[in-house]
Amino acid sequence: MNDETTPANKNPEKAELRCGWTTGACATAATKAALTALITGEFPDPVGIILPKGEVPYFQLANEGLGEGYAMAGIVKDAGDDPDVTHGATIISTVYPAPPGTGIIFRAGEGVGTVTREGLAIPPGEAAINPVPRRMMTEICEAICAEYGLPADLVITISVPGGEEIAQKTWNPRLGIIGGISILGTTGVVHPFYCSAWIHSIHRGIDVARAAGQKHVLGATGSTSEDAAQALYNLPDFAILDMGDFAGGVLKYLREHPIDRLTIAGGFAKLTKLAQGALDLHSSRSQVDKGFLWQIAERAGAPADMKERILLANTAMEVLELTQSIGIDIAGPIALEARQTALKTLRGAPVEVEIIVTDRKGNILARV
């Protein structure tokens, strides 16, 4: 899970899906509005910002506050049609002057996390506001201050009411980001059902594990297989990667950033797709090949009269149950083939790979 990809609201089958805005873009727009009001006494509404790729979105203000030595503005995040747990959250920026020569200081307010572990893009002790949003806010503040002939010595506090609860639906607690969500985004735009944010979360998890000197990490396709593997190893939270369907996101990053040992745990159907060579295991992007399963079953000793039943089976689990009913093990060969796919993808990187196949109840069917 991660802030901008965990399913929350929409249907991927809908045509012409609408893009939205990242928490970083919302924080930047809120900061621009707050700083403008701090200097002029007036809030721009709507407030426009220039994103890294040149887009110029405008944001309506949901909150305004102007007091002695501070200004505050809030924007409700619209993630478009992306299934995003931060959709509808209010991103608030409070800006006030800092001592001369201080520059721009970022602080985590209510609902924004604080980094506590090495390995992330932001050092421990700092607000979980990622580098691109920091740069966007810094540049816009420097430009506004220069326009009015003022030094850009400011404290910017970003808050998200309810953010601590939202963060429990993300990978932040396992990454060592405590107290709330992260302020994220590299382009400012949320593309519906786009995989980059989720894969970035996987990469952050590997970075944290490496920085902690962790030698063994786990990537699971879901909570059932994760629990089964954890019953064996009891790894620390930060050693559990946010893999889900993105086996390729794990393996390709480990190729360049190796960790000694990787355990991939998953249900039979998901790992059948990995065994077939698929690296994205989502049902809309890869399917179980019943012909492949028949080949596996035939090599394991299944009789010829079972071929048609396997080819006509509705699900991979039905095939598994058919073979189990006559004492044929296909989970073991699937695990071996999945391991070969993983090793091929790693391209010789020094990573030992283990595969654990589970059933729907979390029973281990194969471990190689």
UniProtKB/Swiss-Prot annotation:
InterPro entries the UniProt entry points to: CbiD, CbiD_sf
Catalytic activity entry: Co-precorrin-5B + S-adenosyl-L-methionine = Co-precorrin-6A + S-adenosyl-L-homocysteine
Keywords: Cobalamin biosynthesis, Methyltransferase, S-adenosyl-L-methionine, Transferase
Protein name per the record: Cobalt-precorrin-5B C(1)-methyltransferase
Gene Ontology MF terms: cobalt-precorrin-5B C1-methyltransferase activity
Pathway field: Cofactor biosynthesis; adenosylcobalamin biosynthesis; cob(II)yrinate a,c-diamide from sirohydrochlorin (anaerobic route): step 6/10
Entry's family note: Belongs to the CbiD family.
UniProt record, GO biological process: anaerobic cobalamin biosynthetic process; methylation
EC number: 2.1.1.195
UniProt entry tagged with the keyword Methyltransferase: yes
Domain of life of the native organism: Bacteria
Native source species: Brucella ovis (strain ATCC 25840 / 63/290 / NCTC 10512)
Keyword field contains Transmembrane helix: no
